[in-house]
């Protein structure tokens, strides 16, 4: 029978463990602070930002928010970033993507203080990750590692196929899994839209991570017997229901369970972990900036 890896439960445990670290910092006068920056009025982005603010409130992290008009020049956003870089109450912040077309997101990330870059996207933090000295692991890849750990799935010596090469998931996860570490030591294949014979590469993997942003791209015929399947994708597809849509992953769930030994659902798998690891990185940022040691889960 296929094990369903419950991301909600694992994320809840991590949040519970973080509350002790947050209390330690708060008692020392250094309550962690996380800011979100939203440029424009994208409905999905507004939803994500609201969820992150609620997460902060639940664990005792101070939450700050900055709205920037979507028609404002890039310099307006840059000024807000500069102010956050100088704000000692804000230990970490994120600039919610996507930004409007007239703003270069890479330039936005370059302007973020690397010590407050709790997304882990700044070039300095990317370099540290590749070198095996990560300050902040990007939230989704770190969440995937924590899910595997919680399910007692060892990556050492395993063949891992990652479907997707994004800067947010595919690339950093590959770099994390090849590190000489207890949650690494894997042999990793990264596939993408130009990969030939994708199914052959996924079928031979011990662990398949689907992170291509393509609804139900990976089906059961592409999963080897006994493989572990981590579905990072969250896609809206049309459906005959009250909402008019449903959420599906990058994996065709029902057929994949015929072969997989373990699988993450959508929703309720990787998504909650991404949010939990943002809290984790914020607490770590506060610990580093305030020079106060705390135990992290």
Curated annotation (Swiss-Prot):
Gene3D superfamilies: Leucine Dehydrogenase, chain A, domain 1 (3.40.50.10860), NAD(P)-binding Rossmann-like Domain (3.40.50.720)
EC number: 1.5.1.5, 3.5.4.9
GO biological process: L-histidine biosynthetic process; methionine biosynthetic process; purine nucleotide biosynthetic process; tetrahydrofolate interconversion
InterPro entries linked: Aminoacid_DH-like_N_sf, NAD(P)-bd_dom_sf, THF_DH/CycHdrlase, THF_DH/CycHdrlase_cat_dom, THF_DH/CycHdrlase_NAD-bd_dom
Domain of life assignment: Archaea
Keywords of the record: Amino-acid biosynthesis, Histidine biosynthesis, Hydrolase, Methionine biosynthesis, Multifunctional enzyme, NADP, One-carbon metabolism, Oxidoreductase, Purine biosynthesis
Molecular-function annotations in GO: methenyltetrahydrofolate cyclohydrolase activity; methylenetetrahydrofolate dehydrogenase (NADP+) activity
Catalytic function, reaction form: (6R)-5,10-methylene-5,6,7,8-tetrahydrofolate + NADP(+) = (6R)-5,10-methenyltetrahydrofolate + NADPH; (6R)-5,10-methenyltetrahydrofolate + H2O = (6R)-10-formyltetrahydrofolate + H(+)
GO cellular component: cytosol
Binding site for NADP(+): 164-166, 193, 234
Pathway linked to the protein: One-carbon metabolism; tetrahydrofolate interconversion
Pfam family, one: THF_DHG_CYH
Quaternary structure and partners: Homodimer.
PANTHER family, alphabetized: C-1-TETRAHYDROFOLATE SYNTHASE, CYTOPLASMIC, C-1-TETRAHYDROFOLATE SYNTHASE, CYTOPLASMIC-RELATED
Protein function: Catalyzes the oxidation of 5,10-methylenetetrahydrofolate to 5,10-methenyltetrahydrofolate and then the hydrolysis of 5,10-methenyltetrahydrofolate to 10-formyltetrahydrofolate.
UniProt similarity note: Belongs to the tetrahydrofolate dehydrogenase/cyclohydrolase family.
This protein's name: Bifunctional protein FolD
Organism: Natronomonas pharaonis (strain ATCC 35678 / DSM 2160 / CIP 103997 / JCM 8858 / NBRC 14720 / NCIMB 2260 / Gabara)
């Amino acid at each position: 029978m296929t094990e369903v890896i419950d991301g909600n439960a694992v994320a809840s445990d991590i949040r519970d463990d973080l509350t002790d670290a947050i209390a330690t910092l708060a008692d020392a006068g250094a309550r962690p602070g996380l800011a979100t920056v939203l440029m424009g009025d994208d409905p999905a982005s507004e939803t994500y930002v609201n969820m992150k603010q609620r997460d902060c409130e639940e664990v005792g992290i101070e939450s700050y928010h900055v709205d920037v008009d979507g028609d404002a020049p890039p310099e307006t956003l840059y000024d807000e970033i500069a102010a956050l870089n100088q704000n000692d109450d804000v230990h970490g912040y994120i600039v919610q993507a996507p930004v409007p077309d007239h703003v270069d997101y890479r330039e936005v990330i370059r302007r973020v203080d690397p010590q407050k870059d709790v997304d882990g996207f700044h070039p300095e933090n990317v370099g540290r990750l590749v070198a095996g000295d990560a300050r902040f692991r990007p939230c989704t890849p770190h969440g995937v590692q924590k899910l595997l750990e919680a399910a007692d799935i060892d990556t050492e010596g395993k063949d891992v196929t990652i479907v997707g090469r994004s800067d947010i998931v595919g690339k950093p996860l590959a770099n994390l899994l090849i590190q000489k570490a207890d949650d690494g030591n894997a042999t990793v294949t990264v596939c993408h839209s130009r990969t030939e014979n994708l199914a052959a590469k996924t079928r031979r993997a011990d662990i398949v991570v689907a992170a291509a942003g393509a609804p139900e791209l990976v089906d059961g015929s592409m999963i080897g017997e006994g493989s572990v399947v981590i579905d990072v994708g969250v896609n809206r597809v049309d459906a005959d229901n009250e909402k008019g849509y449903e959420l599906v992953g990058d994996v065709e769930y029902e057929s994949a369970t015929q072969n997989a030994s373990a699988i993450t659902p959508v929703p309720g798998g990787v998504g909650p972990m991404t949010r939990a690891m943002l809290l984790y990185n914020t607490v770590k940022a506060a610990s580093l900036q305030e020079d106060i040691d705390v135990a992290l889960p």
